[in-house]
């Protein structure tokens, strides 16, 4: 089941969630490349971003990037979003990376500008205030893997193929890959993977720690999505403010020395002390019941 965002937070008509009324007659008939679904019922709080550019295997083109940036800008203001899950509506592919056909038509200046914009997109994903999960049910190459690396958690089908393959195309990772991969795997291994342009399957990626979980693919081709959804369901019952602050403490702490990181943790902890959710958690423990967190 899906819910519709409050009017102030709705996406443009062509991005309305499934089940919403048809857009006004002036709306474009073009299928949006980014679709947003907010789940309801027991999954309320989980919002999905579906990448849907089948003719280009979800390649990162201008329209794709623009729609994704706009979706993120609106969703980050929606307090009902507790987990953001990235998945593909195209079977067999997560995101094939840069749209090289589109890029061939750009001047050198335009290429530089677009890559800078792409880098900004990945930074927006990384800075999203709630946990983000990439469900990788197929190819995640180049910029596609950089998108997944910008997420907090990654789930892959064992048969999924991923890699920063830019050096095989005369390029280098330009949307955060040279920075996030070594932070994920360590410098030496990241260099090896980038220098060689090596591709990994989901099982290999799990062995290296590149993904959190690898699962056998199913006939529908969405096994990683189902595992990612199960992980999101584990996050949902937890105190949302504490989860957000935990993400801030980890992300900012990883950028500094441990003493500074401890100071960041202290500041985050101090922000959580006066919350209703902390008091509810203490009361629930004392009364031996499940807590009911409200995000306040």
From Swiss-Prot:
For this entry, the transit peptide stretch runs 1-17
The record, for InterPro entries, names: ClpP/crotonase-like_dom_sf, Enoyl-CoA_hyd/isom_CS, Enoyl-CoA_hydra/iso, Enoyl-CoA_hydra_C
Family statement:
Belongs to the enoyl-CoA hydratase/isomerase family.
Keywords in alphabetical order, please: Acetylation, Fatty acid metabolism, Lipid metabolism, Lyase, Mitochondrion, Transit peptide
**Origin species:** Mus musculus (Mouse)
Where along the sequence does the record put site: Important for catalytic activity? 146, 166
In the record, N6-acetyllysine modifications are located at 101
Name a single GO cellular component: mitochondrion
Q: Which domain of life is it from?
A: Eukaryota
Where N6-succinyllysine occurs, the residues are 101
Q: Which GO terms describe its molecular function?
A: lyase activity
What is the protein name for this chain?
Answer: Enoyl-CoA hydratase domain-containing protein 2, mitochondrial
Keyword Mitochondrion applies: yes
PROSITE patterns assigned to the protein according to its UniProt record, in alphabetical order: ENOYL_COA_HYDRATASE (PS00166)
Where it sits in the cell: the answer is: Mitochondrion
Name the GO terms of the biological process aspect: fatty acid metabolic process
